[in-house]
């Protein structure tokens, strides 16, 4: 016999110690007039070692202070409640920890909860909160399907309690003679110690079985008791949707009416659905649905469902709502590196499908006709491809557009406006750089072996330009060095660019700063230098002082070993004369310097108009 293991709440006086436990079925059932045998076992701590073991059963409550009716005691001489006198008996042997209870001649008033209390003598008396609930039936229980639909196989169950060992039930079916292909079967069910005889009747109901009564009868061997239960068959047929009408296409903003007609037994409930959403429902034969000011979300599949308790049937129609394109949605590579491919997809919802165009300015970059998307591709991306684009979607009901920006990342570019300007109190160099992302900018002074960056006292960062350029300003105070060379270097994650800055001398500015006295001194210096150079040429190789021009670094294809001193001497003589007369010099376009090359110098060969920028006097 299978029993349910239950946890125990121990109540009463005396010691409370684990493991006290009791086992019994939580629910029992029996037919009125029969009996029920309630299996029960209990346990207690071994250390108690009681001299005697007994017990009793309460009805309705486990608490002695509530004076519940006593059902049965293990000691037969003890009193019990009059309702159970002669009916209930303590079948188990408490010394063997068996607390089985038997109740005969059951009646409906004996249905309820039964509690066991152990008595080990003295104060060792405990009530278990776990209990068995008894249900007394007047007849077998028939379980009929919620729906008996014509043509569908059905099964009716007849359940009979089988918890009285002296009385074993016998089950028969009644009213099955006219049923189509009836098949009866039986089986025993054991639900946590409570047993039932379960009979099943399978058949295929027809419309003509409507109202037919089918039941089950129960008898017992060696007993005159009998029980009967039956039910009338309510065979119905599922509804049918017989009519459906309404438009299949409308324009956004229109009013729409849909109609549905159905029949069935019983009269069906008619419902209008869009997807799983119920829009309207009423019982009857027909139902109309009104949609006002429809939009794109109101389109789709509309279903009319006719339903009763035995089945359902539906039919659907498709409603299409035409509307102008919605704002296009942009997806793709909106941020790329120069040289990488660009792929941007523009998608727009509309009905019908729209003509999609991607524009930059007035130029068509990509187009698609009657599609829900268009893809623009550029291979490879160039810095000039960055900028604002627009996607336009249009159909016969309207148009819409969305603008988007493509950013092309590229290494720094030093702008032509970058240069150095000499003033009376020093040099001011401006470097302007364009790049994406922004670059870090420094000034390199090779002749001083110095790098000036943001944070240095001679470095000033100007506000970003309207074109996104960044500007760094280098201010060098003091006299202008003849050999001063300034490079602007910029770097971001895509590369490094360096450029020699051109020197710009405002006309007459140097001469104005020098003044008449300075002019006399400068003229004397020029005469001395010219004479000195002439002497040097005559005494070449004799160990006398000589003028040694600084050789420029070799450029691509250049020869750094060429002896260019005569030209440098001639240039120096002309340069000093021009400087003394206040002549502006230093024209020429700035030159780009790659990160791996030396800063380019002016060529040492060629006409005198392109002399080296500087020279030095060295006395041996």
UniProtKB/Swiss-Prot annotation:
Question: Which locations, inside or outside the cell, does it occupy?
Answer: Membrane
Q: Which residues lie on this side of the membrane: Extracellular?
A: 18-516
Q: Which Pfam families does the entry mention?
A: Ig_3 (PF13927)
Its principal location?
A: membrane
Identify the tissues in which this protein is expressed. Answer: Exclusively expressed by myelinating and nonmyelinating Schwann cells and oligodendrocytes.
Q: Where is this region: Disordered?
A: 539-562, 583-620
The chain positions of domain Ig-like C2-type read 151-233, 239-322, 325-407, 414-495
The record places the following residue ranges in the Cytoplasmic compartment, namely: 537-620
Boundaries of each Ig-like V-type domain copy?
A: 28-106
Per the UniProt record, which residue ranges are transmembrane? 517-536
What GO MF annotations does this protein's record show? carbohydrate binding; sialic acid binding
Membrane topology according to the record: Single-pass type I membrane protein
Name a single GO biological process.
cell adhesion
Q: Which UniProt keywords apply?
A: Cell adhesion, Disulfide bond, Glycoprotein, Immunoglobulin domain, Lectin, Membrane, Repeat, Signal, Transmembrane, Transmembrane helix
Family the UniProt entry places it in: Belongs to the immunoglobulin superfamily. SIGLEC (sialic acid binding Ig-like lectin) family.
Q: What is this protein called?
A: Schwann cell myelin protein
- Could you tell me which species this protein originates from? Coturnix japonica
Q: Which gene encodes it?
A: SMP
């Amino acid at each position: 016999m299978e029993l349910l293991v239950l946890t125990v709440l121990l109540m009463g006086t005396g010691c409370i110690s684990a493991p006290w436990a009791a086992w019994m079925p939580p629910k029992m059932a029996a037919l009125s007039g029969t009996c029920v045998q309630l299996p029960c076992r209990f346990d207690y701590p071994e250390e108690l070692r009681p001299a005697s073991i007994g017990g009793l059963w309460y009805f309705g409550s486990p608490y002695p202070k509530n004076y519940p009716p006593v059902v049965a005691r293990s000691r037969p001489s003890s009193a019990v409640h009059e309702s159970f006198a002669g009916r209930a008996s303590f079948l188990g042997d408490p010394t063997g920890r068996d607390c089985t209870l038997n109740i005969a001649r059951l009646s409906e008033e004996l249905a309820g909860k039964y509690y066991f209390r152990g008595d080990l003598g003295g104060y060792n008396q405990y009530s278990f909160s776990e209990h068995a609930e008894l249900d007394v039936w007047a007849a077998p229980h028939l379980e009929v399907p919620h729906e008996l639909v014509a043509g569908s196989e059905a099964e009716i169950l007849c359940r009979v309690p089988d918890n009285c060992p002296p009385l074993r039930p016998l089950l028969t079916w009644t009213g099955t003679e006219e049923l189509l292909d009836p098949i009866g079967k039986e089986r025993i069910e054991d639900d946590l110690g409570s047993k039932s005889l379960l009979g099943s009747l399978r058949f295929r109901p027809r419309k003509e079985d409507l109202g037919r009564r089918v039941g089950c009868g129960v008898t017992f061997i060696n007993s005159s008791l009998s029980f009967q239960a039956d039910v009338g068959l309510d065979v119905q047929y599922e509804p049918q949707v017989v009519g459906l009408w309404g438009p299949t296409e409308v324009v956004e903003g229109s009013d729409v009416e849909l109609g549905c007609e159905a029949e069935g037994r019983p009269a069906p409930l008619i419902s209008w659905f869009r997807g799983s959403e119920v829009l309207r429902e009423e019982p009857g034969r027909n139902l109309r649905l009104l949609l006002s000011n429809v939009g794109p979300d109101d389109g789709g599949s509309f279903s009319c469902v006719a339903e009763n308790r035995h089945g359902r049937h539906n039919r659907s129609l498709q409603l299409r709502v035409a509307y102008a394109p919605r704002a296009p949605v942009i997806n793709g590579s909106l941020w790329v590196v120069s040289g990488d491919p660009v792929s941007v997809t523009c998608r727009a919802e509309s009905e019908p499908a729209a003509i999609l165009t991607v524009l930059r300015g007035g130029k068509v970059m990509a187009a698609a006709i009657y599609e829900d998307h268009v893809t623009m591709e550029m291979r490879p991306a160039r810095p000039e491809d960055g900028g604002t684009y627009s996607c336009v979607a249009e159909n016969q009901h309207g148009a819409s557009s969305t603008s988007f920006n493509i950013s092309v990342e590229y290494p720094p570019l030093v702008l032509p406006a970058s240069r150095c300007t000499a003033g009376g109190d020093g040099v001011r160099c401006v470097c302007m750089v364009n790049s994406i992302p922004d670059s870090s900018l420094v000034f390199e002074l090779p002749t001083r072996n110095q790098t000036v960056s943001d944070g240095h006292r001679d470095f000033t960062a100007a506000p970003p330009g309207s074109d996104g350029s960044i500007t760094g300003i280098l201010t060098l105070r003091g006299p202008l060095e003849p050999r001063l060379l300034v490079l602007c270097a910029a770097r971001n994650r895509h590369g490094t660019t360096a450029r020699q800055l051109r020197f710009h001398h405002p006309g007459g500015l140097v001469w104005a700063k020098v003044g008449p006295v300075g002019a006399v001194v400068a003229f004397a210096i020029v005469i001395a230098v010219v004479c000195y150079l002439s002497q040097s040429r005559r005494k070449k190789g004799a160990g006398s002082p000589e003028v040694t021009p600084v050789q420029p670094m070799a450029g691509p294809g250049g020869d750094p070993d060429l002896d260019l001193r005569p030209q440098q001497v001639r240039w120096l003589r002309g340069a000093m004369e021009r400087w003394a007369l206040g002549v502006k010099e230093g024209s020429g376009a700035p030159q780009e310097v790659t990160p791996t090359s030396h800063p380019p110098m002016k060529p040492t060969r060629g006409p005198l108009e392109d002399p080296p920028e500087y020279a030095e006097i060295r006395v041996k």
